[in-house]
């Protein structure tokens, strides 16, 4: 029986399969909808069996109650919540290419956090950094939306975001803050060297101290009538522009 006090729930095929592939030892048990026998369910069960994970066939209603939603796709896993506390130097010291980091300032919506993790994975970002307080944590909803990226992208939480940004600067990382009123655009600022993109919550933007700590504020050009983008969309534009520039270097 797993230690409930040291566990959290993740759900959805992408999230559970990613956990099986990257950290099978961190899985206590997997609950599956006993009525599902399609190819995706069989594939997950095969992976679980190969890795020796404990599988508990369950009623769909039980899964609904466990996670508080019916959008679990018939698979829920109880995993070890005692993740190794990664520090920024742990990531930076092991890099063989210029750093590409995503920093989230005060994101409150778990859907946005999950989407940002997914974008960071797709763009090959080396870590996502966020404050421990006044921001959403890595809960089951964020993990599901991340579609497995929560177990592939290092997620680092810090007690003082401004201090963390200064640590990045001391390590040679150029810290760029996304701000709509900035003069330079993401297409004119050089991102070929070690770069950290800092994005704030949709609507509120970057906090004052965060803005003041950034090396430079940069805007995403807007050509239509809307004034802002969802933070995950903005993250994708910034990170992939960095990748585009680096591919041309």
Named regions from a protein language model:
Residues 17, 121-122, 143-149, 208-249:
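Structured adenosyl-cofactor binding patch, chiefly the S-adenosyl-L-methionine
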Residues 61-66, 83-85, 161-165, 184, ...:
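A short acidic, often aromatic-flanked loop/helix-cap motif at beta-alpha or helix-coil junctions
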Residues 176-232:
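Active-site/ligand-binding-proximal alpha/beta "capping" segment
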């Amino acid at each position: 029986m797993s230690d409930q006090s040291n566990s959290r729930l993740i759900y959805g095929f992408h999230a559970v399969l990613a956990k099986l592939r990257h950290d099978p030892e961190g899985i206590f048990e997997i609950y599956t909808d006993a009525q599902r026998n399609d190819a995706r369910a069989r594939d997950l069960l095969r992976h679980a069996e190969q890795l020796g994970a404990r599988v508990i066939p369950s009623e769909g209603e039980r899964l609904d109650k466990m996670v508080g939603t019916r959008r679990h796709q018939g698979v829920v896993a109880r995993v070890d919540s005692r993740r190794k506390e990664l520090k920024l130097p742990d990531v930076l010291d092991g890099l063989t290419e210029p750093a590409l980091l995503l920093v989230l300032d005060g994101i409150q919506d778990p859907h946005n956090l999950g989407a940002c993790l997914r974008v960071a994975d797709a763009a090959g970002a080396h870590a996502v950094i966020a404050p421990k307080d006044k921001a959403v944590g890595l809960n089951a909803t964020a993990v599901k939306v991340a579609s497995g990226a929560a177990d592939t992208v290092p997620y680092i939480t810090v007690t003082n975001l401004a201090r963390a940004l200064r640590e990045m600067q001391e390590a040679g990382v150029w810290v760029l803050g996304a701000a709509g009123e900035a003069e330079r655009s993401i297409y004119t600022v050089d991102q070929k060297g070690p770069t950290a993109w800092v994005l704030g919550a949709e609507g509120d933007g970057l906090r004052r101290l965060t803005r003041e700590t950034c090396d430079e504020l940069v805007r995403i050009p807007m050509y239509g009538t809307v004034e802002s983008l969802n933070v995950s969309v903005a993250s994708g534009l910034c990170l992939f522009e960095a990748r585009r520039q680096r591919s041309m270097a």
